[in-house]
């Protein structure tokens, strides 16, 4: 519909109204009518001319210019910008560093950015996420020289460019873009992974640049429009290619026996499309390339037989382990020593394993026996010959097969006789276990007869005679108090070797006697119950001898000779009775009765000679 026709229709439509209005206004002049008509024409023509101009602008190239201008204005005014303030706020939101250079990762995906900008301060970035934005060009990455990973998938990129500053880039993701040619990647010397899925790659020339990417190991070309089988020649020239994805391309249908062919031609390939390339698959593919399907079938059977043999061997090994465990368990239940495994028994025999412990045990035994004989020679220099006895003991231990039992049997008399200083070495003498046991029994019997053999060498020690008599005389005073008056003392039955080294003066003897009397009341029951009663069960004859060797008569004679000792005894008896209470009164009365009876007998006998008095004193101390 043309503008002139519309103007005529508009004029025709307005003329009747004007005539009517003129009829209504018959009183108005013709000049007024013309002016009103002109005004209405101007008002009617104005909008039509503007609409015509707008229609002309919409036609042709001017229409595209208007659209691009409007898009630029909307993008500049309405779209989000990658400003410094926005980046700082984003770092704070993701709890990153406020200082830009300290950040190594920046998450800018799903933000709607249309360009890369204001990243000059982020010099330490190693990973940059720009996924799912509206970016149309790769730019402004000069400051990111440390970048390792760049994710630009799902954007509006049409070309690969401006990647020269990224000399350390390892992974580049350009999937879901509009890229038609792979280019400008040879400037990345360490590029390892390239993802180009869902792009516009079609021919061999589009991927020819991959020949220059010598370090590329992972390549994803899935869901493109590659259809020429010659792309395999380009992929063969990549020496480090390990992972390849060609799914979604027409070329997979154009290559016969696609998987076998690609596996054979790409020698280093370990993963193709959606699954790995196993050694068995590669061997079968190579067999197919040599002899067809028959060779492939034969190779597959060989691999299956080897795998089956491996499984059966493992099962047999498990069964063998189980059987050996059961045998060892049965032997252990029977009390037998379980035999070692066949491999261990072939390499090292049980005799060879037992030799080192046997030698070590023998050495220890010899050292122990030698030390014991040295100690014996030091104590008894008049009995040499320890070396000969050592040789005898060594020969005996060599002949005995059961070492632990012999050691246990030989250690028993040693412990039994270790209570005596002089008899500890004597237990190790002899040529057999029976001799040592006999010596131990003799020592036990002599222990109750000679009660104080250990105190023969006490002269060099710093122990007073009063303390010595306290230790040795307490049980004897208790026995004296427990004896009856009509007991017959046997003075010549047991000599006392302790008195050989005691002083013979009356003062020293009396002091020892009364020192014993002072301490006898305090420990009257303990020695009787703990020492003499257990020994009475083992050696009843010796107990009677000990009891009979304590006559009261010499004690009373000495008391008559020295009045001072009598006074001390009188003072000690009340003190003991007062301290011990009523429990000690019977002993005091017994001593008083004995004193009276023995005083009467001493008057009848008369005063003895000094020699007899000394002998009586020795027997009285017993």
Swiss-Prot record:
Annotated Basic and acidic residues bias: 32-42, 62-80, 326-336
Phosphoprotein keyword on record: yes
Modified residues (Phosphoserine): 349, 464, 487
SUPFAM superfamilies per UniProt: Outer arm dynein light chain 1
Intervals holding LRR repeats: 101-123, 124-145, 146-167, 168-189, 190-211, 215-236
GO terms for cellular component: axoneme
Protein name in the entry: Dynein axonemal assembly factor 1
Matches recorded under InterPro entries: Cilia_flagella_integrity (IPR050576), Leu-rich_rpt (IPR001611), LRR_dom_sf (IPR032675)
Record's compositionally biased regions (Polar residues): 1-11, 539-550
Domain LRRCT: 249-288
Statement: the UniProt record of this protein carries the keyword Phosphoprotein: yes
